[in-house]
Amino acid sequence: MQSPWKILTVAPLFLLLSLQSSASPANDDQSRPSLSNGHTCVGCVLVVSVIEQLAQVHNSTVQASMERLCSYLPEKLFLKTTCYLVIDKFGSDIIKLLSADMNADVVCHTLEFCKQNTGQPLCHLYPLPKETWKFTLQKARQIVKKSPILKYSRSGSDICSLPVLAKICQKIKLAMEQSVPFKDVDSDKYSVFPTLRGYHWRGRDCNDSDESVYPGRRPNNWDVHQDSNCNGIWGVDPKDGVPYEKKFCEGSQPRGIILLGDSAGAHFHISPEWITASQMSLNSFINLPTALTNELDWPQLSGATGFLDSTVGIKEKSIYLRLWKRNHCNHRDYQNISRNGASSRNLKKFIESLSRNKVLDYPAIVIYAMIGNDVCSGKSDPVPAMTTPEKLYSNVMQTLKHLNSHLPNGSHVILYGLPDGTFLWDNLHNRYHPLGQLNKDMTYAQLYSFLNCLQVSPCHGWMSSNKTLRTLTSERAEQLSNTLKKIAASEKFTNFNLFYMDFAFHEIIQEWQKRGGQPWQLIEPVDGFHPNEVALLLLADHFWKKVQLQWPQILGKENPFNPQIKQVFGDQGGH
């Protein structure tokens, strides 16, 4: 699963053609292209493809196509301004090359955003030109021979070095690294701001100047004078003088939901409209600034902690919304502690962002769902980089000990197993990617090969034409799942009960097929890897039903006072 500071600033902006970043750890493998070069190449090919296809769809010049793309982008985050800066810098050469029938691969190699290092294979997304690659590239370089652009591109210049963008880039980078809200006046890890790790990720603060006021805490003096736990229930019933919090919530077993996850749990999503020329319009990019400041994640629509109405038209709700429906006293008590690229190995770097006080707060349901990155990487040989069962045991035990020292007594922890990711190749490899649908010139197999060649694939092991490698990856995933299962069966902790649940994606596929759907419709169309919103909500439904059947004590009681809470407090202040 992606760990993309570079993709965050390049692909989503569509303009990250020369960005350098430090979000991903340095790699000791010198044979691997630098992450900066790999992601920059992907960003360039994506942008040039969109420009070329916009010209085709609208029967316009390349110049008009570039201007059209910029006109679609919002002013927020200087997206439109940055787009015009890029056109000014690179536009004339892109026009010359596309006018000479060079494809996006050739354009990006000519402008040196893609580079073939000595001894390395040629990485290309589209079919190779009919003439030899060497001849085509020489021809393209002659076309732009006198251009000052190549000097600029070689300099490694960073879009974030532009004064207008420096602060924005820094904000996003800080939020990603620390996994706590950037805007948090009282430093209680809760915010009144939605993105940059704000209330899209954890319940909205209702008093950002008082660190003792935050979602999930036990009420202070039954919230007679203020709403100390932000669930929208406070004050005193004038009829009998009993505090509403005491009347409606005492003994109802309130609890929160906390997800420790990766990009799947955070709901990584790149909208197909952003790269599909035939669907592109002024409305396509309205939500791009929000997505950028959420690291291309959509936790507000995720299966675990989503609180907004689904955008995909199915009736299933997130686990958090089901907990709220069961007991309205649980309002706003959710935390999505997920990061792109997270695994059992690096969870310790951001688990401190979890907010729970053993004494002051209600118990929590914690879902540990590191479902991919312990077997996934972009390395040319991904098998040695996979987490071993022994190392997973050590990592998870360290996490559980941390949870035991922070969670209130009566909490519950569920360890999620890993999926069998062979369904990705099986269901997508021969289908056209959104970028390839217009001209029927690019399948998911080509996308996977391109990303693997650049060593920026989110999961080389499963996104590979090599069946043996796909099988090995699934075998290791099964071994790790069995390790989690053994931990749940044998380990005991004082402050929480421990459970294990299979990541039963095959059951989700079967359920979707019963409704007339196809398996490929459950996968994110742009990256061809992550479960999409439909899949995440179906997984939440599967989780809820299994827990209800096997471990109903995890969910707490149904609150008989829910109707009265709604009558007195309406939507409880919303989310």
Curated annotation (Swiss-Prot):
Residues 37-118 form the Saposin B-type domain. Binds 3 Ca(2+) ions per subunit. The calcium ions probably have a structural role. PROSITE patterns: SAP_B (PS50015). It comes from the Eukaryota. Ca(2+) 3 binds at residues 223, 227, 229, 231, 233, 245. The active site is at 263. It catalyses: a 3-(acyloxy)acyl derivative of bacterial toxin + H2O = a 3-hydroxyacyl derivative of bacterial toxin + a fatty acid + H(+). Cleaved into a large and a small subunit. Disulfide bonds join 41-114, 44-108, 70-83, 123-453, 160-169, 206-230, 249-329, 376-459. Residues 173-177 are annotated as: Lipopolysaccharide binding. The keyword Hydrolase applies. Inhibited by EDTA. SMART domains: SapB (SM00741). Removes the secondary (acyloxyacyl-linked) fatty acyl chains from the lipid A region of bacterial lipopolysaccharides. By breaking down LPS, terminates the host response to bacterial infection and prevents prolonged and damaging inflammatory responses. In peritoneal macrophages, seems to be important for recovery from a state of immune tolerance following infection by Gram-negative bacteria. PANTHER family: ACYLOXYACYL HYDROLASE. Heterodimer of the large and small subunits; disulfide-linked. This is Acyloxyacyl hydrolase. It comes from Homo sapiens.
